[in-house]
UniProtKB/Swiss-Prot annotation:
HAMAP family: NDH1_NuoN_1. This is NAD(P)H-quinone oxidoreductase subunit 2 A, chloroplastic. GO terms for cellular component: chloroplast thylakoid membrane. It is found in: Plastid, Chloroplast thylakoid membrane.
Length: 510
């Protein structure tokens, strides 16, 4: 009895503190109000988990989703405000950073309903899973607003540590343990290389850590063309390359995709790329302003390797998740075109637009993999044969997302790639755009091969997995379908109304 009274008092006191802090932040303003909402959500998750039983599990999902939606709302209310630098220059808020934060929050918001049924069926620890997702989201948001080299290093570590834990969440699975080990080792090595690059920038600029001050320091010390800057550029490119996973920094991607829980893969496949892209645009554009030719060349090489290797190797894959891993390597090659073009020819606007479409296309495809995998226990591409005869909605939604990934008109992926390639062509990247067009045709081949399997109607070609396919009786199945419907709509309809989306993206340029 005393224990229950103490718990009730603890909850009441914590709620009062939460409401007071919320009131102060809401009416007195804050540079990191959206991030604070997620922090309060994390605190509430811990409170409910420590003071309740299993019957309160729906509240955990509700609090997580509500925190993310409220954070998105706070970002939208802050739209078009004047850029601000806070925390002694460590953090900057402007429209450009906030659009990437919005994309990260959107990814997390869609991933939570996508994960509900998987967590229930596999009996994973729910609270810890949600805590890691929200904390990783928080790290990604801080990375988008980072304005100095220390924050750019610390923020992705917050994201990465949660990613390592999520990838090894099914600890009884040997493949998951192997994926986590590779992910951790590669992540640690890349972080070391990234710090090495920042140390060269720090020394060459005369001890500066803020991005703009590094440029001023390089001018004062006359070190902007020194060999140390070249070493810094190569090291930082390698470090960021691990997060973006372009070739040849892609070795960890297929194994982590295959061994990690599917909802985790869905989350990592988009959030890490969005956060790393936001960081890359600022790092290459500001500290390496005087080395633009050099980093353009480096990124062009990475883009070409990614588009060619990613799409060619994807053809040979038999696992759906490994195929999407190599597909994502090719997709990041297209995104790099936007980074190279920059804001002079709407490169950043086209990159942001394409990443918005990529989120919906990729998460829609992973929602189908989660749903099919829970009912059949397989991830083999051939086992999808004849799915249309058992679940037309799942097969058709999968086909739309795959066609959009391939870039077929009139879907969103086509218009996203078209605008991205057009911006690259206007910027004079003729060879890079030509490679992108050719590899896009290659990607259409393996996407259509999967769609052909999905639509197979002849009984002799339907696999035993599909013959025994049964729709789930769980209520949580609706949450996967909800995520899938949202992603399918976002993968199709926005292509018809590209101009408003491009205009919004153009308004974000710093």
């Amino acid at each position: 009895m005393i224990w229950h009274v103490q718990n009730e008092n603890f909850i009441l006191d914590s709620t009062r503190i939460f409401m007071k802090a919320f009131h102060l932040l809401l009416f007195h303003g804050s540079f990191i109000f959206p991030e604070c909402i997620l922090i309060f959500g994390l605190i509430l998750l811990l409170m409910i988990d420590s003071t309740s039983d299993q019957k309160d599990i729906p509240w955990l999902y509700f609090i997580s989703s509500t925190s993310l939606v409220m954070s998105i709302t706070a970002l939208l209310f802050r739209w078009r405000e004047e850029p601000m630098i806070s925390f002694s220059g460590n953090f900057q808020t402007n429209n450009f950073n906030e659009i990437f934060q919005f994309l990260i929050l959107l990814c997390s918001t869609l991933c939570i309903p996508l994960s509900v049924e998987y967590i229930e069926c596999t009996e994973m620890a729910i609270t810890e899973f949600l805590l890691f997702v929200l904390t990783a989201t928080l790290g990604g948001m801080f990375l988008c607003g980072a304005n100095d080299s220390i924050t750019i290093f610390v923020a992705p570590e917050c994201f990465s540590l949660c990613s390592y834990l999520l990838s090894g969440y099914t600890k009884r699975d040997v493949r998951s343990n192997e994926a986590t080990t590779k992910y951790l080792l590669m992540g640690g090595a890349s972080s070391s290389i990234l710090v090495h690059g920042f140390s060269w920038l720090y020394g060459s600029s005369g001890g500066e850590i803020e991005l703009q001050e590094i440029v001023n320091g390089l001018i004062n010390t006359q070190m902007y063309n020194s060999p140390g800057i070249s070493i810094a550029l190569i090291s930082i490119t390698v470090g960021i390359g691990f997060k973006l996973s372009p070739a040849p920094s892609h070795q960890w991607t297929p194994d982590v995709y295959e061994g990690s829980p599917t909802p985790v893969v869905a989350f990592l496949s988009v959030t890490s790329k969005v956060a790393a892209s936001a960081s890359a645009t600022r790092i290459f554009d500001i500290p390496f302003y005087f080395s633009s030719n050099e980093w353009h060349l480096l990124l062009e090489i990475l883009a070409i390797l990614s588009m060619i290797l990613g799409n060619l190797i994807a053809i040979t894959q038999t696992s759906m998740k490994r195929m999407l891993a190599y597909s994502s390597i090719g997709q990041i090659g297209y995104v790099i075109i936007g980074i190279i073009v920059g804001d002079s020819n709407d490169g950043y606007a086209s990159m942001i637009t394409y990443m918005l479409f990529y989120i919906s296309m990729n998460l829609g495809t992973f929602a189908r993999i989660v749903s099919f995998g829970l009912r059949t226990g397989t991830d083999n591409i051939r086992d999808y044969a004849g799915l249309y005869t058992k679940d037309p909605f799942l097969a058709l939604s999968s086909a739309l997302c795959l066609l959009s990934l391939g870039g077929l008109p009139p879907l969103a992926g086509f218009f996203g790639k078209l605008h991205l390639f057009w911006c690259g062509w206007q910027a004079g990247l003729y060879f890079l755009v030509s490679i992108g067009l050719l590899t896009s045709v290659v990607s259409i081949y393996y996407y259509l091969k999967i769609i052909k399997l999905l639509m197979t109607g002849r009984n002799q070609e339907i696999t035993p997995h599909v013959r025994n396919y049964r729709r789930s009786p769980l209520r949580s199945n609706n949450s996967i379908e909800l995520s899938m419907i949202v992603c399918v709509i976002a993968s199709t309809i926005p292509g018809i109304s590209m101009n408003p989306i491009i205009a919004i993206a153009q308004d974000t340029l710093f």
